[in-house]
């Protein structure tokens, strides 16, 4: 049996702390009510429209019917699968401050890896639906953007991550999206 090589990279403490805080926002099943705004990983913020029970293969299953705000698509999430799909409440005001602190922490080291590998890592972070993970993608790409022109793929990735981040922060703060986007851009245009 051949030994496998494992690449190890150090992660700044602030990142570890952010990820730990992000996992605290996971919710237990059946904690959402009709009208509540929630985050569905990979799709963004949605609103619980109804809670319905459907019979599937002879078994009654309760679902959250969630309308995704950005795309106006309705998604059915089984109540007993909330944790496994990553459905969670919108970020709290305390977490919003932590997100802005993380964005301001521009002392990151971008590994010298291929764009394809970074792309996969960033997509994995976005797919978690955790605001701190999405925020790290935005921060990292904005920091890279200060040193070089982003490729087409990097620009699209930044646009996707920033859109998800801005939408959730706007709802969490009770603000509008252009204001939040301007605040984020201000963080990265300010002289370090």
Q: Where on the chain are the PLM-derived regions?
A:
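Mixed-charge, Lys/Arg-rich low-complexity intrinsically disordered regions
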Residues: 2-34
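Conserved hydrophobic positions within beta-strands
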Residues: 46-48
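A residue-level detector for short acidic-glycine micro-motifs
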Residues: 50-53, 68
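Short, solvent-exposed secondary-structure boundary/capping segments
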Residues: 54-65
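A short macromolecule-binding patch
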Residues: 65-67, 71-80
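Charge/polar-rich, low-complexity and marginally structured segments
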Residues: 85-192
